[in-house]
């Protein structure tokens, strides 16, 4: 009886030990897998001007946030930004438009990435990811790639254009030119009305005859 009890106890302890080892292994695998999925990568994007970009500026892909600006350096002719993409699973085609835009009531600056092409799932670089040593920068944007950004929608340009238009309307020469044109159009329309009435009276007279 005692021997049977000891055997049962050993089997129970062995099962508990195996369960603990399995649970520990599963936890380690989950942590490693999660860490690898969330591993970020960085790219450099050059702009002609800052356009309101600062550290923390949001980076979006097709309208969804995927990263942020983590560094800015200035040269004599351009601004170089260092962008961190939050997950290495975010694959960006190399043929993409990178531009600054302003949004919201406060005109917050964001960086939009708009892909021009759709990636083939069979691409080797797509399977390996941007952090791979064999990443093909001709297909996708790889870790530490150097890219050129452009200027997109900017409310300062809109305000400047509106100001120029208002200044044009304040120009006396333009005002008198429009006044003269409107006067001639009114005279022409009056003459057309008189001509139409005259033709109508002639037609009525001929019909009466």
From Swiss-Prot:
Query: Its GO CC terms?
Result: chloroplast inner membrane
Q: Where in the cell is it found?
A: Plastid, Chloroplast
Keyword Chloroplast listed: yes
Would you say which domain of life the source belongs to? Eukaryota
> What Gene Ontology molecular-function terms does this entry list?
lipid transporter activity; phospholipid binding
Q: Which UniProt keyword terms apply here?
A: Chloroplast, Plastid
Q: What is this protein called?
A: Uncharacterized protein ycf22
**Gene name for this UniProt entry:** ycf22
